[in-house]
């Protein structure tokens, strides 16, 4: 997506970029497919609305921004499923005495949370989300409310998450109000009825499709099954001491091992084929083609970006940490029992569950109105994260 957006922005400035993409489609983890004749998202299905950038981009592309159906989120524990409190930030409740919170954590834990949050705010407010919740509301609130939500969104335990990053302004509001519950309530009031996530009506996969179409309509080129192999400074085009350019992409190809007068960078590409393991990068198997250009944008995952840039800049730094593996299972169900959405738009599974192997379930056709409208009667699309 980053490469598509960059190329589209260049066309808005009157340039005609060349975008190379090693896979056979553009958009990366924003992609669509069909199941039972219904088009749906197989990757990312929406975005957080805390920042307006993605919603603004969708509008500029002529797409309709769609909020999800308002309904409670659910969490599964081995002792049962329960609805999460609606007036909350990352599962942190604005009122620990409310019925939904007491149902989730029990009366004793709710009383302890209220007592902890009544204590004076210390001079040193914990920086990690986990320690912040633990000290102000107790372990049960952290484990049963915050852990599943924060872990599901950020794929990390709360103790490893910076409160200022994942919940901006929350620590400052705690200092100002003297209560974590009141700090959450203030953020909930500010948020109002605005949804915390949104998508594109008809599927988020329409965003890369539209970007692709508009780039080509503006004169840009998109070369799929074409991977970048290397970037190097052009010996004739790059003046001593010149700084790397930060905008633009490749121009005309030149024979391998040659460069054109005036171009600062040589970008060598090659055709690719599908890897037998689709989760791994495609395999370069074509003859090299070198482009000479004044400006290059590198918009890809960290590991290949470091490889591409290693010949032109110092890329030494911390080792990259591999993400946790995850698989998606998509189901089209003929199930009248799901018409009432007994688990709303989906359910998270608490870490440590011994009865359910999945990490989460999303009832896609219930969550997104346009997708639900495209499903036949009693047919439901669900996504299981394993």
Residue ranges of model-derived segments:
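Glycine-rich FAD pyrophosphate-binding loop
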Residues: 11-34
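Mid-domain catalytic core of redox enzymes
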Residues: 226-379
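Dinucleotide-binding Rossmann-like beta1-alpha1 core, especially the glycine-rich loop
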Residues: 36-121
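Conserved dinucleotide-binding and phosphotransfer motif residues
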Residues: 13, 218, 289
């Amino acid at each position: 997506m980053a490469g598509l957006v960059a190329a589209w922005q260049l066309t808005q400035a009157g340039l005609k970029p060349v975008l190379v993409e090693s896979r056979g489609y553009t958009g990366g983890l924003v992609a669509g497919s069909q199941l039972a004749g219904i088009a749906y998202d197989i990757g990312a299905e929406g975005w957080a609305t805390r920042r307006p950038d993605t919603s603004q981009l969708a509008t500029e592309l002529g797409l309709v921004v769609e909020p999800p159906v308002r309904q409670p989120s659910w969490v599964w524990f081995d002792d049962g499923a329960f609805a999460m409190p609606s007036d909350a930030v990352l599962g942190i409740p604005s009122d620990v005495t409310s019925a939904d919170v007491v149902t989730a954590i029990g009366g004793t834990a709710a009383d302890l949370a209220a007592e902890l949050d009544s204590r004076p705010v210390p001079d040193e407010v914990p920086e990690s989300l986990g320690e912040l919740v633990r000290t102000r509301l107790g372990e049960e609130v952290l484990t049963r409310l915050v852990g599943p939500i924060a872990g599901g969104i950020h794929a990390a335990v709360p103790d490893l998450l910076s409160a200022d990053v994942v919940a901006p302004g929350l620590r400052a509001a705690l200092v100002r109000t003297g209560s974590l519950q009141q700090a959450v309530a203030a953020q909930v009031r500010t948020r109002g009825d605005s949804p915390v996530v949104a998508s594109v009506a008809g599927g988020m996969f329409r965003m890369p499709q539209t970007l692709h179409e508009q780039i080509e309509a503006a004169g840009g080129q998109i070369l799929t099954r074409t991977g970048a192999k290397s970037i190097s400074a052009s010996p004739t085009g790059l003046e001593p001491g010149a700084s790397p350019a930060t905008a633009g992409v490749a121009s005309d190809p030149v024979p391998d091992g040659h460069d054109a007068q005036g171009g600062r960078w040589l970008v060598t590409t090659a055709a690719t084929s599908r890897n037998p393991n689709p989760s791994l990068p495609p395999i370069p198997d074509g003859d090299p083609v070198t482009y000479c250009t004044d400006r290059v944008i590198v918009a890809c995952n960290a590991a290949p970006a470091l490889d591409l840039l290693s010949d032109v800049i110092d890329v030494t730094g911390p080792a990259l940490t591999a993400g946790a593996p995850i698989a998606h299972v998509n189901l089209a169900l003929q199930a009248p029992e799901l018409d009432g959405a007994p688990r709303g738009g989906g359910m998270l599974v608490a870490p440590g569950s011994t009865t359910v192997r999945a990490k989460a379930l999303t009832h896609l056709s219930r969550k997104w109105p346009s997708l639900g409208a495209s499903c036949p009667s009693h047919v439901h699309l669900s996504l299981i994260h394993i």
